[in-house]
């Protein structure tokens, strides 16, 4: 559900427990997020405020944020005005998605300091605003002006004005009749406009969720939809409206609220609980966990799509290059014909008029003197036509060797690009994507496409540390144990290189699917040890699992001692050659 007024009020109710805490740290991880370090009651807490249009919220957080090395201007201003202040009060008004944090410092009784931090959680209009005791804005994360089609001025020295609302306040309703009287006019209007029968209204032809959401302040569409589902309401009646009213009241007045995750944790709903929560910040941390997973998933998806777009554009370029090379090779297949034309023209010069001839038919003495028609350019003399055919022949003959080399190189390049796509398909975390981005950034194949920005400044700002044999910081292959034997699996091309060429011992056994993109797999062994056949087969199955053909059957897997695996100088990441191998089919 949306972070609506009901969630805002419920979160703020828990945050009453941070009254008396002092602000001792202020960070701004990104342009939409501020975190406040709080100290009090012998504990440290971190309050997260996010004004991203899709994920705006306020809650305590247990997830560390990566902060820029240089604090942004707004962060510096908040540090100046907030650090050392104590939280005097935290509250909301009605069901508005606005949280007010009153701050004070009474260390100097003659000069008390009072400030207010206002968090407006209103989608794309969200903001973080700092005011003084007279409601004069000191600064805000986003500035707006009535000159820019805004209904309020939000900038330094302007007076803070509470946003207007044309909706009813649910909290000011005293009875169900007040609730129904607010909805009834819209109900009648909707029935008249759509020529509906009041006796035959149901959820399918009447948008009750939208009507309630549009009538009452702070109640989101998804919140009402969940209530309709929980109460199993299909028909529109006054009794059902009363059930909805009572359910909203129950949630708002509940002392213990929890969240219910649905659809593989893609959404959540509030529900009342009879069990007292172990933590006084239960709702805060559960909603924080939900949004952390949601943002991480979105970040992963966006970052992956950016890299995939870059790789596919490069793949398309090299596939086009291969197509052009094949066209050139097809042209080279005709080069002997051009030589034949030149020879036959030369030997028949006495039979060809000097000019104005489009073609000539002569006997082909290479083919039992069978007749052959040779095209001519009528602008030129016959001898010059022959020279042109010899020139074409020599040009294609010289090109043939070069084009064959280019074709081999291009096929290897395409093979490497496809191996990177395989890596991307198997990436599980932002760190995995960061390693792939680092790999392609260092490769000349992608140089003209590398204008894409890393979606994850949080991930990409983290420079990959060099892989070392003793310091396994970046080098973190997948690890398995089969019948007591350790098996290591590379996660990307660079890690495959390091695993096989530097980390593995010469007596270890190397596995890789034959002619199929996949991970390098190393079976750790002792010198002169004979590995049982069933272990070799299980490791081969593991190698097949970590491959592009993992869903196929009868997959060929080559294996040999690491000492027989070599990496050619200048070859692409992940590319090796090997010998003395055996093959298992799994």
State where each predicted segment sits.
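Extended, highly charged segments
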Residues: 1-520, 524-586
């Amino acid at each position: 559900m949306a972070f609506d007024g009901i969630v805002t009020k419920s979160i703020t109710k828990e945050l009453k427990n941070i009254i008396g805490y002092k602000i001792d740290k202020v960070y701004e991880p990104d342009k939409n997020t501020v975190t406040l370090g709080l100290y009090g009651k012998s504990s440290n807490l971190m309050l997260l405020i996010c004004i991203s249009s899709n994920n705006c919220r306020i809650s305590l957080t247990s997830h560390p944020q990566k902060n820029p090395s240089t604090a942004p201007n707004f962060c510096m201003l908040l540090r100046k005005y907030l650090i050392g202040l104590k939280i005097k009060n935290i509250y909301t008004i009605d069901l508005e998605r606005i949280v007010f944090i009153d701050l004070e410092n009474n260390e100097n009784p003659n000069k008390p300091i009072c400030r207010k931090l206002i968090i407006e959680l209103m989608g794309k209009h969200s903001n973080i605003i700092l005011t003084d005791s007279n409601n004069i804005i000191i600064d805000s994360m986003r500035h707006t002006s009535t000159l820019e089609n805004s209904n309020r001025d939000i900038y330094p020295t302007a007076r803070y004005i509470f946003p207007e609302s044309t909706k009813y306040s649910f909290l000011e309703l005293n009875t169900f009749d007040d609730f129904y009287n607010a909805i009834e006019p819209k109900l009648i209007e909707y029935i008249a406009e759509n020529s509906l029968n009041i006796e035959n209204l149901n959820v399918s032809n009447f948008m009750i969720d939208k009507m309630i959401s549009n009538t009452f302040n702070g109640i989101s569409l998804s919140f009402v939809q969940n209530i309709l589902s929980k109460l199993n309401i299909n028909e529109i009646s006054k009794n059902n409206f009363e059930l909805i009213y009572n359910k909203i009241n129950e949630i708002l007045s509940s002392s213990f609220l929890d969240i219910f995750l649905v659809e593989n944790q893609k959404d959540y709903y509030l529900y009342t609980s009879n069990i007292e929560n172990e933590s006084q910040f239960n709702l805060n941390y559960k909603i924080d966990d939900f949004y952390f997973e949601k943002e991480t998933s979105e970040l992963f998806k966006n970052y992956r799509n950016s890299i995939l777009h870059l790789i596919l554009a490069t793949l398309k370029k090299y596939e086009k290059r291969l197509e052009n090379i094949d066209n050139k090779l097809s042209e080279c297949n005709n080069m002997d014909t051009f030589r034949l034309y030149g020879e036959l023209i030369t030997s028949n010069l006495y039979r060809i008029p000097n000019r104005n001839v489009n073609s000539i038919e002569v006997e082909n003495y290479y083919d039992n003197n069978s007749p052959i028609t040779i095209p001519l350019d009528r602008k030129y003399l016959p001898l010059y036509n022959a020279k042109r055919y010899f020139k074409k022949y020599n040009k294609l003959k010289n090109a043939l060797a070069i084009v064959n080399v280019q074709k081999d190189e291009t096929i290897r390049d395409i093979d490497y690009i496809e191996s990177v796509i395989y890596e991307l398909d198997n990436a599980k975390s932002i760190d995995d994507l960061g390693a792939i981005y680092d790999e392609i950034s260092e490769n000349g194949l992608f140089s003209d496409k590398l204008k894409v920005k890393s979606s994850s400044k949080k991930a990409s700002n983290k420079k990959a540390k060099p892989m070392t044999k003793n310091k396994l910081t970046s080098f973190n292959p997948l690890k398995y144990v089969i019948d007591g034997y350790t098996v290591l699996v590379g996660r990307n091309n660079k890690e495959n290189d390091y695993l096989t060429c530097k980390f593995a011992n010469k007596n270890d056994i190397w596995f890789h699917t034959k002619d199929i993109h996949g991970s390098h797999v190393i079976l750790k062994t002792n010198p002169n040890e004979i590995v049982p056949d069933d272990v070799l087969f299980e490791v081969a199955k593991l190698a097949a699992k970590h491959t592009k053909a993992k869903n196929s059957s009868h997959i060929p897997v080559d294996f040999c001692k690491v000492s027989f695996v070599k990496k050619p100088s200048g070859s692409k990441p992940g590319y090796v050659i090997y010998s003395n191998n055996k093959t298992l089919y799994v």
